[in-house]
């Protein structure tokens, strides 16, 4: 298990690209495209996730590529903000590999978050194997998502968070 104290400017050497269990708490993570990526199981608790304006039509926060039996990236009580990104131009994630997973639980989402929330990878035909989930989002970027984004009920969200904490939190 790894713990990163101060977050990272991604993509970087501490980005969760290695297939390990990683834990981030009370830190800021910033980048423009796919800045949280890779095959790790990672828990982000009470972090600020900042998207930097790249002046392209769209940006993506996560690009998970984890194992089918893993937890993927789990964000709990995080604040998704931007540095002047236009409204609706930033997606919470897209699957780098078919089994990528991202869950956003009880997070505050700025207006920069696209109404769809998540996006398929442009050239992938197997994006339906990925798992994108959300529960309890608030803020201007919270919206009804497409059918392929799973809406978790409170019990499902609590169970996912419990499992992610057990797997990722340092002892």
Name every feature range the model reports, one short phrase each.
Residues 1-171:
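Sequence-level preference for short, compositionally simple segments enriched
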């Amino acid at each position: 298990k790894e713990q990163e104290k101060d977050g990272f400017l991604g993509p970087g050497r501490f980005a969760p690209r290695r297939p390990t269990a990683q834990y981030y708490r009370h830190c800021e993570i910033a980048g423009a495209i796919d800045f949280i990526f890779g095959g790790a199981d990672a828990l982000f608790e009470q972090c600020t996730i900042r998207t930097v304006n790249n002046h392209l039509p769209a940006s993506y926060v996560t690009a998970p590529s984890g194992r089918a039996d893993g937890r993927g990236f789990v964000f709990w009580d995080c604040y998704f903000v931007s540095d002047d990104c236009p409204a609706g131009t930033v997606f919470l994630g897209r699957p780098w590999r078919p089994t990528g997973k991202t869950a956003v639980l009880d997070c505050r989402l700025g207006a920069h978050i696209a109404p769809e929330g998540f996006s398929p990878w442009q050239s992938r035909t197997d994006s339906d194997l990925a798992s994108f989930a959300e529960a309890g989002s608030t803020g201007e970027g919270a919206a009804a998502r497409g059918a392929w984004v799973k809406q978790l009920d409170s019990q499902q969200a609590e169970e996912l968070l419990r499992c992610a904490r057990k797997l990722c939190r340092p002892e």
